[in-house]
Amino acid sequence: MGGDTYGFGGVNRIRTVNVSQEEADFASDSLADDLPLLCCRHYPQASSFVSVLGVCSGWLGLLAPDLFIFVLTNILLSGFLILIAFRAFLSLIGAFARRTSKASEKDKSPPEVLSAAGAQTLPHYSVLVPLYQEAASVPGLVAALEALDYPTDRLDVLFLTENDDTATRQALLAQLAASRSLQTRAQILTLPDGMPRTKPRALNVALHRLAGGLVTIYDAEDRPHPDQLKRAAAAMQAGAGNLACVQAPLYAYNAEESWLAGQWALEYDVHFGLILPALAKFGLPVALGGTSNHFRVSALRRAGGWDAWNVTEDADIGLRFARMGERVGVISPPTQEEGPETLRIWVRQRSRWIKGYIQTWLVLMRQPVLAARQMGVLNFVSGLGLLSGAIGSALLHAPCLVWLLLCLLSPEVGLAPIGQIVLIAGYAVSAGAAGLAPNRTGANRWKLIASFWLYWPLLSWAAAIALYEMLRAPHTWAKTPHALTRQTPQSVQEAFA
């Protein structure tokens, strides 16, 4: 492992480190070696229960196909109806919690809100920034990190780069040279070639280097609220000992640039504005976002770090915390993100998400009885239900739309009453949740709601790609390109003034 310090203006301050192959391999394989049943490196085999259920279903399909279709359809529709009701409940609870939180914060001045994290008690904080082919995003990223309000003697920033990404490292060196506040706090780590080339592999390299305290992750396009670190530290200090992580809300700054970006932003507003706060309120498992989650380093290490082979390491670690008896909370200071504006970018990102959800589902169902015992039955059903719903709805949106069109065009084809209920309830609950969610972007909310039915079938396209990649390239990370939007993000000071 070699390192250099780059000097500018006669002062040597920016440290670069070449990560050894041994260290990188350990980051890739440590979870698989220590907790193999919780890692998706080796294709998870279904449990005996799932295998028996599959065999019985296959025999029923062969012996009585009409009965099989009837039973399967009603089971699926009933499951979706229960899930829709659960999401409606979470949306209402999330809306109430949000209004209560806003009211309580209005009664406090900023110093009082942050009093639990006084200047003398703030823990050491590490900020991890995994980057690949992100040279164009570096100037805005560095400006956003400079704006973070946290004592400089207790803050480290680790930029994680890949061996073949010289352009991003050069951009970092140039920007950091002009940043007096980051020069002494920043390190640039270069990972050697190796498999898998994923974000969690890079994060694990950094995790094993941290001294302790708290750690958070920001992506290249992120613009976090300046108070986010202090608020997270305050939440950790005020929370119970089993509070492993707090999640900050994410929202798109470019929601008005395209219809797809608007729909993506609306999903985020519902997810981070309603669903996650409700799950956290009841202590239910939370599939974390990929950025702006703030962890206790000790909790991450007890969990074995991130799964380097899972392409949605965020969802996976959230469910693993639940299996350990750890909880996830939420904080209010948000992070701006760049939403995908084109179909090509959206499909690449969404297919990776669905592939990762499938990987996470397979790990959870590898030993479902053990998982239920570890998490508690309610937590297990909640986590499994939301994960299954995300995968199942993505797979079925387009086929259901085709079936609905057939029902409308052909009198011979009828839609069962339970199907009608699921269809109406699904749209009604989604529209209601969208109306209750915070509109952080200023996009025309009702135009987006009216076009839900055009957006949802696209999920089936992404799901089909995810299934194909599960067979051909399960651990390949489809990178989402950034810095492509025509809309320039506001400066951090303008955005959160």
Regions found by a protein language model. Give the residues of each.
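Catalytic donor-sugar/metal-binding loop of nucleotide-sugar-dependent glycosyltransferases
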Residues: 318-336
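Cytosolic-side membrane-insertion boundary helix
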Residues: 16-53
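Acidic donor-binding segment of Leloir-type glycosyltransferases
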Residues: 146-194
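The conserved acidic donor/metal-binding loop of glycosyltransferases
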Residues: 219-223, 306-309, 321
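Cell-envelope/extracellular polymer assembly enzymes that use nucleotide-activated donors
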Residues: 123-126, 156, 301, 316
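Acidic donor-binding loop at a coil-to-helix junction in glycosyltransferase catalytic cores
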Residues: 311-317
